[in-house]
UniProtKB/Swiss-Prot annotation:
Disruption phenotype: No phenotype during vegetative growth, transition of double strand breaks to later recombination intermediates is partially blocked, crossovers are reduced and distributed randomly, with a high incidence of homolog non-disjunction at meiosis I. About 10% of wild-type level of meiotic divisions at 30 degrees Celsius, at 23 degrees Celsius delayed appearance of meiotic divisions, which eventually reaches the wild-type levels. Decreased spore viability.
Family of this protein: Belongs to the helicase family. SKI2 subfamily.
EC assignment: 5.6.2.4
Function (record text): DNA-dependent ATPase and 3'-5' DNA helicase. Required in the control of double strand break transition and crossover during meiosis. ATPase is slightly better stimulated by single-stranded (ss) than double-stranded (ds)DNA. Unwinds Holliday junction (HJ) DNA to Y-DNA and to ssDNA. Efficient unwinding requires 6 nucleotides of 3'-ssDNA; seems to initiate unwinding from blunt ends when they open slightly. Binds HJ, dsDNA, ssDNA and 3'- and 5-overhang DNA.
Catalysis performed (reactions): Couples ATP hydrolysis with the unwinding of duplex DNA by translocating in the 3'-5' direction; ATP + H2O = ADP + phosphate + H(+)
Keywords per UniProt: ATP-binding, DNA-binding, Helicase, Hydrolase, Isomerase, Meiosis, Metal-binding, Nucleotide-binding, Nucleus, Sporulation, Zinc, Zinc-finger
Cross-referenced PANTHER family: HELICASE FOR MEIOSIS 1, HFM1, ATP DEPENDENT DNA HELICASE HOMOLOG
Domain Helicase ATP-binding as annotated: residue spans: 148-322
Protein name: ATP-dependent DNA helicase MER3
Length: 1187
């Protein structure tokens, strides 16, 4: 796909356009006849409210200049464009550089329109099919004046308009414009709406879903399930957040078709780009603008003085800046008066400051409320309660005339509501919150104290909005509200559907008074925050192969808003200057900063350098794919190997993603009670086995996870019930992050070949999916209608896992759980939907290399299932193979719906001759407790080859057990006739196999072997023995085998030759060559044994006590922790094969699959098995869909 990267680094070049207009040219001034020449002109200034900022507009100033699209102006209108009105400076940067005409032509065009007394446009100007989108018949003043730029133009546009002016309609006009351009063919059209918060996204979804009948509307946020995500990606209008869209666009190669269909991007609250999380918004807009062709951006912003910088950043396809439409406060439907009060504090305690703010509230309410509804935003939940109590005790309002119809469960809330005062925060129950909102809407509540939960969403009739303090808890510390939060709170004052006038008051520290005055008056300069976490986004762009050198990194940055602002105000980016030379020029500073970040990524192995280019490693791909912070990823990479389950849990709990949480003071006792629970798997105890003080976020996260997985009961001490809702919300936040963190850890441990850590990570991931520890009876809670009480009843009847539950009839289930007749079948049907998993392994080949064994296993898996979806989740299987030492051999993932027929693959493993075990496991990732494990020990090699060598040392597992035979009792060489295998194959031996007799005879007598260890060529130089054979360099004679490559074949005589003593006086004609099929069936010889002395030394080592043959074939672990001996189950199978039956019901035998043998072996065990070209099961790593 052709992208705009062809134009990267060409910002100084412009394309001449005949339509470009020099705003400084007085000839560009158009004047109409004026009825009143004294009428003041207004400048379209940028003013923004985050609540209503839903619209994306594009302004075509050329049409205005040429008189097109201005049907709503007439000769009586006072309309003019002057050089002064444009407010465009003569320089793009603050450097004293002379501009060329081309550079001036690329300055953003800012339209300034004088007020018009002309009536507003009617919706009849639109086609009949479009009018149904709007619930009104006439556009307001702002919408009418923006109509030509939005509906009659296709250029990028930046719009500024005050809160309550109806900007949502402008977004809808932009959508209708696209529909018009595509002739209503929307099958191949995508529209993206991006808002900074989920609340705004949900609000827009509710508005647009019923409005656009012919367009499908979907929403993508962190709360969207997998099935909803797949459905939303197919919609015409996708409503999403910056972080979610960033996550999706990081998988550009996976969804390239989707992104090619995007034609319109609507950006709400673009001024949030100045906040730390605004870097994601800046990155995705840059990515879309550079990689998509013919895409239109319509963005809304609050009032900022440097809106032209946004226009310079969001350039059009012809490299021209975006158009600017800016409207002042006169366009607001409800006039809003704003005040900022600063207070000086002698105390440093924020709780004491909150009490001082309370004392000032009475004066403010009496001055500004006018006996109308008041909404007070408080920084904390405790502050909402204390504020409500303070106002109640001071009788700020007389008792409400209307009586409350609700009696909330919270006693304090109920007491306050009877006096017309209430509080609202996320810690109270949903029923109480709903009751408070209804009573406030009904007028029964005069004063409502709330946290920021009411800043968006429900429209409340608040005449006066008071922001009581501008600091709130964030990341375990007090921080200033974001600009978005403040603007959203102010936007709640005087809503159009309730008031004609409103008032907003900000109470803050005297030091911050000027800051908030600049914010509400639009004089706060907008800066970029991309540099604060640029390292993570550079890693993502490297993974996308957008950045592969320092030059491409700098070119990519040239397309960002950060580059525009750094050129004008480098002093605002001290983090950049910290790593660059003091007197460096602008581009050199950017170059040095990028070089430092890339070197850091190389150091921590997130990227590496290959052939002079930066390439993303497996760690970098995992970090990008799962949207992990740099600090968390570095922690995963540097983690110790072979972590236990507790170690994995601790590693997860210390991730950077949880730093936004905090341990509240009133929660410490709650978590202490949880920590002392005997059901807790890993409590935090001191050396004296007493509970530690729970004051760290990592402790809280760990306890929340264990609380859920262990099915613990909520503490019952006095006052604990008030914290139940808080615990539920914190638990939801923790679980939302856990899944992508664990999936990233899976990828990390695969790359590190750390089988133990991977196994425990997958165990924890399955437990989180099932909301229970996998090796406990709590797995039964995954079934519908099964709760803690039902689990206890089942345990009393000996039912502890899903398999045992599957054996019960519906009648038994009803009896055990005390259910009504007919309810047991529902649970039985739920169990029957669980897949039945099968796995079988067989040892195919064994050979020796460098004193180690190379084993090749054939693995066959299959599944019997009615549906590949269970409880709304697509099921997937994890197949892991690891050594008992903890080293990972192989890991694969496969969707259950891909197992319509059995699948097979081969795994090669290199193990030591000690009693090392290999563990094969298969588990369903989305269901805890559904999986099987096979443990294959080197002991089983003896039974595999017992027909050849009954007397074999089981701890050696070397060449002899595969090849040598026992001598006769009289000391003579035993017969080496054909030996039948269990699988029906025969071993063909030629006359030259007499070498085996020789070696066995030497093995009996150490002295005889030592005397014959060295054979001189002179001793048998007689042609009498050669009989046509050639003499080898070691003195032995060549054999007559017809092997193609005697250095690689299985015959010792081919590799070592035949000693003269054992050459039979037979001609070549009497020797029967070994057929090729026989060669394949023979065990492989060690490639590194090249001399007879070396071989004899190994054969004549002092024999150990021979052990009896072990009849057990494999050990199978069935969750939870049950061990079965399969020797009886597998009596009909050949030695070395294992069958795994999984699920609640018995499954039929699998028909074996014929897999072609492979003779290729790799020196890297994990690499060769994971990338096995002969396997028909692709390695998917941790390819997990985003939440």
């Amino acid at each position: 796909m052709k992208t705009k990267f062809d134009r990267l680094g060409t910002g100084k070049r412009s394309r001449p356009s005949p339509n470009n207009i020099d705003f400084n040219d007085q000839s560009a001034t158009f004047k109409r006849n004026k009825k009143n020449s004294r009428q003041p002109s207004f400048k379209v200034g940028l003013s923004y409210n985050s609540l209503l900022d839903d619209c994306d507009d594009e302004n075509e100033t050329e049409e205005i200049f040429e008189g097109r699209g201005l049907q709503f102006f007439d000769k009586d209108d006072n309309f003019s464009i002057t050089a002064d009105d444009t407010q465009v400076t003569s320089k793009l940067f603050d450097h004293d550089l002379e501009q060329t005409p081309d550079e001036e032509a690329k300055k953003p065009k800012k339209v300034t329109i004088r007020k018009s007394a002309k009536k507003c446009l009617s919706t009849t100007i639109l086609p009949d099919s479009f009018r149904g989108v709007f619930k009104f018949t006439e556009f307001n003043k702002m919408q009418s004046e923006a109509f030509p730029s939005i509906y009659e133009s296709n250029e990028n546009c930046i719009i500024s308009s005050p809160t309550g002016s109806g900007k949502t309609v402008l977004f809808e006009l932009a959508i209708l414009r696209l529909i018009k351009e595509t002739n209503s063919d929307t099958n191949n059209t995508k529209i993206i709406y991006i808002a900074p918060t989920k609340s705004l996204c949900y609000e827009m979804y509710k508005n647009w879903f019923p409005s656009f009948v012919n367009l499908s509307v979907g929403m993508l946020t962190s709360d969207t399930s997998f099935l909803e995500t797949e459905k939303a990606k197919k919609c015409n209008i996708i409503i999403t957040t910056p972080e979610k869209w960033d996550l999706l666009t990081r998988r550009w190669s996976d969804y390239s078709r989707l992104f090619e269909l995007v034609k319109l991007v609507l950006v709400d609250e673009i001024h949030t780009i100045k906040e730390k999380r605004g870097a994601s918004l800046e990155v995705i807009l840059t990515r879309m603008n550079t990689m998509c062709q013919n895409i239109r951006f319509v963005a809304l912003s609050a009032t900022v003085p440097n809106i032209e910088d946004l226009a310079l950043w969001l350039k059009t396809n012809n490299e021209l800046p975006a158009n600017i439409l800016s409207f002042d406060e006169s366009y607001r439907q409800v006039q809003l008066t704003k005040f900022v009060y600063g207070y000086s504090f002698n105390c440093k305690n924020d709780f004491q400051k909150d009490a001082i703010y309370n004392s000032k509230l009475i004066e403010i309410i009496e001055k500004h409320a006018d006996n109308r509804p008041v909404l007070i935003f408080c920084p904390t939940r405790a502050s909402t309660i204390s504020t409500a109590k303070f106002l109640l005790n001071n009788h700020i309002f007389s008792k409400s005339k209307k009586r409350c119809n609700h009696n909330p469960s919270d006693k304090i809330l109920n007491e306050c509501m009877q006096q017309g005062i209430a509080f609202h925060h996320a810690g109270i129950s949903l029923e109480d919150r709903t009751a408070v909102e209804k009573e406030f809407l009904a007028g029964s509540i005069n004063i409502l104290c709330s946290t920021s939960t009411l800043a968006v969403g429900v429209n409340l009739p608040a005449y006066l909005v008071i922001i009581k303090g501008t600091k709130s808890w964030n990341s375990s510390e007090i921080q200033e509200y974001s600009d978005l939060d403040v603007l959203q709170m102010i936007g709640r004052a005087g809503r159009p559907q309730f008031e004609t006038h409103g008032c907003a008051v900000i109470m803050t520290d005297s030091k911050m008074k000027q800051t908030y005055e600049n914010l509400i008056h639009g004089t706060d300069v907008l800066e970029s925050s991309l540099h604060l976490n640029l390292i993570e986004h550079l890693a993502a762009e490297t993974s996308l192969e957008t950045v592969y050198s320092i030059e491409t990194a700098v070119n990519w940055l040239r397309n960002t808003f950060f580059y525009v602002r750094f050129g004008k105000n480098p002093a605002a980016y001290q983090e950049v200057n910290r790593y660059v030379s003091f007197h460096s020029v602008e581009d050199s500073q950017i170059n040095q900063f990028c070089q430092y970040l890339l070197d850091t990524l190389v150091k921590v192995k997130i990227i590496d350098i290959s052939n002079g280019e930066y390439k993303s490693t497996a760690y970098g791909n995992a970090m990008t794919r799962h949207y992990i912070s740099f600090e968390s990823m570095k922690q995963f990479i540097n983690a110790k190997k072979f972590l236990s389950l507790q170690g994995i849990l601790n590693l997860l709990a210390t991730s950077e993603e949880f730093s936004v949480m905090r341990v509240r003071h009133n929660e410490k006792k709650l978590f202490k009670e949880i920590n002392l629970s005997p059901l807790l798997k890993y409590p935090f105890l001191t050396e004296k086995k007493q509970s530690q003080i729970i004051d760290r976020v990592s402790q809280k996260v760990s306890l929340l996870i264990q609380y859920e997985l262990g099915g613990l009961e909520f503490p019952s001490y006095e006052g604990a019930s008030k914290l139940h809702q808080t615990l539920v919300q914190d638990k939801f936040l923790v679980f939302r992050h856990c899944f992508r963190l664990l999936k990233c850890m899976v990828d990390t441990f695969i790359e590190k070949s750390d089988g133990t850590s991977l196994k425990n990570t997958l165990f924890l991931l399955r437990s989180l999916n099932g909301h229970c520890w996998e090796n406990t009876p709590m797995v039964l809670r995954q079934l519908k209608t099964i709760g803690l009480v039902s689990v206890r009843r089942l345990i009393r009847h000996g039912i502890t896992n899903l398999e045992e539950m599957g054996h019960l009839s519906d009648t038994q289930i009803e009896y055990y759980l005390n259910l009504k007749i007919g309810n047991g079948i529902k649970i039985k049907n739920d169990i029957s939907l669980l897949p039945c998993l099968n796995i079988r392994t067989k040892l195919e080949n064994c050979k020796i290399e460098n004193e180690e064994l190379w084993l090749t296993f054939k693995v066959e898996i299959s599944a019997t299932f009615k549906s590949s979806i269970w409880h709304g989740q697509h099921l997937s299987l994890d197949i892991e193979t690891e050594k008992s030492s903890g080293e990972l051999i192989d890991f694969r993932r496969l969707q259950v719906n891909k197992l319509q027929s059995p699948r097979g693959f081969r795994i090669s493993a290199k193990i030591s001759p000690k009693l090392e075990k290999i563990e094969f496991s298969i588990h369903c990732q989305e269901i805890a407790g559904l999986g099987k494990t096979i443990v294959y020990s080197t002991d089983h090699l003896a039974s595999q080859f017992s027909a050849k060598t009954p007397n074999i040392r089981k701890d050696l597992n070397s060449l002899e057990k595969c090849l040598f035979y026992e001598s006769s009792s009289d000391g003579e060489v035993g017969k080496t006739s054909r030996v039948s295998h269990k699988d029906g194959l025969e071993e063909s031996l030629s006359s030259d196999d007499s070498i085996l007799d020789y070696l066995n005879e030497r093995k009996k007598s150490s002295k005889a072997v030592e005397s014959a260890a060295v054979i001189h060529p002179e001793a048998h130089s007689s042609s009498h023995f050669s009989n046509g054979r050639q003499v080898r360099s070691n003195g032995n004679y060549e054999c007559f085998h017809s092997c193609k490559d005697k250095t690689q074949c299985r015959h010792l005589c081919c590799k070592e030759g035949i000693p003269v003593k054992y050459i039979k006086e037979k001609g070549p004609s009497s020797i029967k060559p070994v057929s090729k099929p026989d060669q394949i069936r023979q065990p492989l010889l060690a490639k590194n044994i090249n001399t007879t002395p070396h071989l004899e030394k190994r054969l004549n080592s002092k024999p150990k006590q021979w052990q009896e043959e072990n009849t057990d074939i494999a050990t199978v672990h069935t969750l939870p922790s049950k061990i079965y001996n399969l020797s009886q189950q597998m009596s009909s199978m050949e030695a070395g094969e294992q069958v795994l039956k999984s699920g609640p019901e018995n499954c039929p035998e699998i028909i074996p699959i014929d897999l072609e043998s492979s003779d290729s072996y790799s020196s890297n065990t994990a690499a060769s098995s994971i990338s096995d070209p002969n396997g028909d099961l692709d390695f998917l790593g941790s390819d997990i869909e985003f939440e």
